C-alpha cells in the first residue's frame, strides 16, 4: 500500500500551560486536497509548522513524504512547496528574480532555474510583470507569485496556510482556479482556511478543528448531510430567544448566534408562511453549508 504523503498521529503541542494542538490525527492521501478548517487560534498554523519540522511536537508522530518529522524534515521539505500565510517575497527583486533566487536554494543551475521562469509566470498569469518589482504588484498578484515560487522544485506536496486571506473576490477565485489546475496535475494539497466557501470548493476532505482538537472529518458534502441534512432559514430581528420559543415547533433544530436565529427545516413552507408579513423581521432561506456545520458542532459561527 502506498505511503500517505502526510500522516499525523495523536500529535500534541503545548506553549507553556496552553495545549494548542490536542491529540490531532489525520492522513492526507496522494492527489487529494485536504483542508484544516477552523477559526484563528484553532491550532492550524502550529500544525503546519510541526509538519514542516519548524516546531517540534510534544507527543505523537508525524510523517511527510514518507519521512519522519522532525528528524528527517529537511530531507522531506525537498519534495514540498509552501505558501505561507503572509507573503515573504523579496521586495528588492523583480518577479523574475524572486523565482530565480528561490530555484538556487534548491541547488538548481542558473540554466535550469531560467528555464522554469517562463512556465511559472504563465501559470501565475504574471507574464507581463516579469520585470516588475514586488511592490508594484497587487495583493492577488503577490499571492500567485508566492504560489509559483512554491512550485519551483516541482513538489509532490503543497502546503498552503490561509492562501486567500486579504484577497478581493476576483483575486480569490483566480487563486482557486490555479489550485484546481494543480490538483488536476496530481499534486497533493494541504490547506488551512477559515473561509467556508474555499473549503467547499477545493477540499476533497476536511478536518474541522476547534482549540486544537479534531471535532469532525469528512467530505464537505458528507459533513453537511450528516450534521445538518436539511435547509436553513436565517431570521434576523430583535429578541431571537423569544422568536425561537415561538418558531421551534416548525424546525427540526434551532441555533442562536448574535441577533440571528437559525432554523433547520425539512419542509420550509410552514415556517415561511408563519414569517410572511411579519414587520421588523428579515429572513433568508438557503441550502445548508459548512458554516452551519461549524455552528452545529461548536455553538458559534466561524470568526476570522
From Swiss-Prot:
Q: Tell me the membrane topology, using the record's own terms.
A: Peripheral membrane protein
The alphabetical list of record keywords is:
ATP-binding, Cell inner membrane, Cell membrane, Membrane, Nodulation, Nucleotide-binding, Translocase, Transport
Q: What is its main location?
A: membrane
- UniProt subunit comment: The complex is composed of two ATP-binding proteins (NodI) and two transmembrane proteins (NodJ).
Top EC class of this enzyme: translocase
**GO MF terms, alphabetically ordered:** ATP binding; ATP hydrolysis activity; transmembrane transporter activity
GO CC field: plasma membrane
Subcellular location, record wording:
Cell inner membrane
Q: Which family does it belong to?
A: Belongs to the ABC transporter superfamily. Lipooligosaccharide exporter (TC 3.A.1.102) family.
Organism of origin: Burkholderia lata (strain ATCC 17760 / DSM 23089 / LMG 22485 / NCIMB 9086 / R18194 / 383)
* Enzyme nomenclature, EC number: 7.6.2.-
Q: What is this protein called?
A: Nod factor export ATP-binding protein I
Amino acid at each position: 500500500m502506498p505511503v500517505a504523503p502526510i500522516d499525523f498521529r495523536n500529535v500534541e503541542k503545548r506553549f507553556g500551560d496552553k495545549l494548542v494542538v490536542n491529540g490531532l490525527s489525520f492522513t492526507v492521501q496522494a492527489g487529494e486536497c485536504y483542508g484544516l478548517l477552523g477559526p484563528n487560534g484553532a491550532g492550524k498554523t502550529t500544525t503546519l509548522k510541526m509538519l514542516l519540522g519548524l516546531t517540534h511536537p510534544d507527543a505523537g508522530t508525524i510523517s511527510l513524504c514518507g519521512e519522519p518529522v522532525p528528524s528527517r524534515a529537511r530531507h522531506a521539505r525537498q519534495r514540498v512547496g509552501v505558501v505561507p500565510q503572509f507573503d515573504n517575497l523579496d521586495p528588492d527583486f523583480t518577479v523574475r528574480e524572486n523565482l530565480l533566487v528561490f530555484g538556487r536554494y534548491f541547488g538548481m543551475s542558473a540554466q535550469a532555474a531560467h528555464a522554469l521562469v517562463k512556465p511559472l509566470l504563465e501559470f501565475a498569469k504574471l507574464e507581463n510583470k516579469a520585470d516588475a518589482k514586488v511592490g508594484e504588484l497587487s495583493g492577488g498578484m503577490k499571492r500567485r507569485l508566492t504560489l509559483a515560487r512554491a512550485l519551483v522544485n516541482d513538489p509532490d506536496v503543497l502546503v498552503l496556510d490561509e492562501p486567500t486571506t486579504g484577497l478581493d473576490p476576483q483575486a480569490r477565485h483566480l487563486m482557486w482556479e490555479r489550485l484546481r489546475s494543480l490538483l488536476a496535475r496530481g499534486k497533493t494539497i494541504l490547506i488551512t482556511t477559515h473561509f467556508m466557501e474555499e473549503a467547499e470548493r477545493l477540499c476533497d476532505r476536511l478536518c474541522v478543528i476547534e482549540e486544537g482538537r479534531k471535532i469532525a472529518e469528512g467530505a464537505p458534502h458528507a459533513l453537511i448531510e450528516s450534521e445538518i441534512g436539511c435547509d436553513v432559514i436565517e431570521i434576523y430581528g430583535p429578541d431571537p430567544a423569544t422568536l425561537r420559543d415561538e418558531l421551534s415547533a416548525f424546525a427540526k433544530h434551532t441555533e442562536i448566534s448574535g441577533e440571528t436565529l437559525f432554523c433547520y427545516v425539512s419542509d420550509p413552507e410552514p415556517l415561511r408562511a408563519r414569517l410572511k408579513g411579519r414587520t421588523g423581521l428579515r429572513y433568508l432561506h438557503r441550502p445548508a453549508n459548512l458554516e452551519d456545520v461549524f455552528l452545529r458542532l461548536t455553538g458559534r459561527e466561524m470568526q476570522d
